[in-house]
Amino acid sequence: YGKKLENLAIRSQIEGAKIIEFHSMEAVKKLPNDPYCYNVMGQWHYRLADLGKMSRGLAKIIFEEPPQGSFDIALDYFEKSIELEPEYIGTYYWLGKTYQKIGRFDDALAIFKKGVELSPPYKREEAFYKEMVKILKKNDQKKS
């Protein structure tokens, strides 16, 4: 459901975000040892925290108060997800992106390095792998 939202208008995305939050929180409560539940909640917070000013302004017109995301809360969810499943490359990608957003660039690079050491098991994770490699190469070029 969440993947479909990415291509919808902002109104549909915000409405869908509320549904995703509710069901994801229920999943975390019912499956507290499932790393993917924490990953989903981390992405939920990341994406809402990363919502542009224009989109957030539009969301405020449509809704009394749009859902609030937080990079710090996303960080907690991603760290918990990795604690429970240290072999899932997707969480390393999102944790690294979150570190970048909060200005912890060295931590982001360290997480990306750990992530690229894992083998990408699925096509979507292959995209995460390639993006992390690209970021690391760009950083290496800056150093030289």
Predicted regions and their residues:
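Outer membrane beta-barrel transmembrane domains
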Residues: 77-80, 86-87, 97, 111
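Register position in tetratricopeptide repeats
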Residues: 3, 47, 101, 135-138
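Structural register within alpha-helical repeat arrays
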Residues: 1-4, 41, 95, 102, ...
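Terminal, low-structured helical/coil segments at or just beyond the last alpha-helical repeat
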Residues: 54, 116-144
